[in-house]
Amino acid sequence: FYGKHYDRVYITSLFTFYYNQTVKTIKSYEKLISPEKIFIGGIMVSLMKEKIKEDIDDRISILTGLLTDSSILGLGDSVNIDIRPLDYSILDDIVYKYPAGDNYFAYISRGCTNKCSFCAVPILEPEFCMTNNIVQQVKTIGEEFGEKKNLLLLDNNILSFSENELEQIVSDIESLGFDKKTKFYKELPLKQFMRKLHRYESDTIASKNVLEETLLYLKEKKKIKKSKIYQEKYLEIMGKIECSEDKLQVLFENENELIEILDFYHRPVGSRRAVDFNQGMDARQLTDEKMRILSRIPIEPFRLAFDSIKYKSIYSDALKIAAKYGVSSFSNYILYNCDDKPEELWERLKVNVDLAKELKVKIFSFPMKYAPINRTDRKFVGKFWNKKYLKNIYAILNVTKGIVADGESFFFKAFGRNVEEFYVILSMPKEFVTYRNYFEENGLAAEWRDKFLQLSIEEKNELLQVLSEKRTTQNSRLSELLG
């Protein structure tokens, strides 16, 4: 960046708890370029516009909400940037291979009909409306960046559409090859590589990364043997490339021959495609008819939100409707540390264990810790929670990579056989949770548990305060538990 001329610098922002890091980034660019050339936007900036104005140069342009008109950037047109396809080429600027890179990222709607107090969507996208033509999005991405195997949709609440609207959406998705019969056949990788190399300017980071990946791929294919003519020709071309100082130019000169040779050996195996409504579905709006429509496309996993125990019956009914139409893989988001009590988290996870067993389906839960959208850190502690409980929930989830599987034995081991056991686990030393097997085998966990259960309610509450606030205690029984 240093020593180069830039007309503008655009800085995006993510979550509000990254506030300090974002401001630090903005200030670092203030030192390198005139503030008039800096534009900031994104989620955090949209939610905290007034606050961030106090912390940065007032000459910086602050853009909030959706970018639906390019004229606000001072450009000479009025393009709705928000509906433009994503730029997949940025994935080539890094060596890391993004796990979801083989997905069409798209959305059909913005906004949500619900106005949940814990959610930022009503502020960021205040109106629920259909915005994008899914067919055009997918075709444009395919033409510019190559075909993708799966479809990942980022709609906040797809079930807010009427049955007629949902019917049209599903028909469009089917027309793109995302039905339960059509298989995906991956094109020859060299064609993808060459398309990228032609698009990028030479000597860019992306060009260098793709060239390196292409050469590695071609090197692996040197073992081809079926056709002696093709084998000899391939090795001849590879020799030219490997000996040349301008490997990219030699690659371009022999592109057609290389593709012809590798196409001869290319035998792609058809694989199932998947549609993922990644933001989850609203169980309150899932009807039998809407599920019948959705069942025509290969949704995997089927994501349902379970934000409160008060929706237990609604959630269970929705999951049963989906299972009736053949869905066997479920995933859900479970909000905690909001208005809920710890036992309500246990109860919701237990509901999933029971439903998985009853319906013979797979349900993977993702507990999501609530963080208020007006805070700049992740230190919020819910009314019925404390720091100790939250640390131990994190310890449990850290062992499982954030996923709670539906197996009964696993669930009882991690979260306890009942609410009482769950509270004991939440109160344990963090090491006892993280290294559960070790401390159970040497008997220390059982010893600690016995002593904890002998405490009065008042003593248990004091212990949790001591652990949460890192203070001392004069109670000898508590000191014994604290080690």
Predicted regions and their residues:
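Glycine-rich beta-alpha loop elements in corrinoid/cobalamin-binding modules
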Residues: F1-G101
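Conserved acidic residues
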Residues: Y6-Y10, I60, S117, K149, ...
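Short, aromatic/basic amphipathic alpha-helical patches
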Residues: K24-Y29, K49-R59, Q168-I173, E347, ...
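A short helix->loop->beta-strand "cap" motif at the edges of active sites that frequently abuts
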Residues: K31-I38, D58, R273, G326-S328, ...
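Canonical Radical SAM [4Fe-4S] cluster-binding loop centered on the CxxxCxxC motif
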Residues: Y98-Q136, F145-E147, S160
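Conserved SAM/AdoMet-binding glycine-rich loop
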Residues: T140-S331, Y336
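A structural motif corresponding to the C-terminal lobe/cap of the Radical SAM core domain
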Residues: G280, R292-I457
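C-terminal non-catalytic accessory extensions
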Residues: Q454-G483
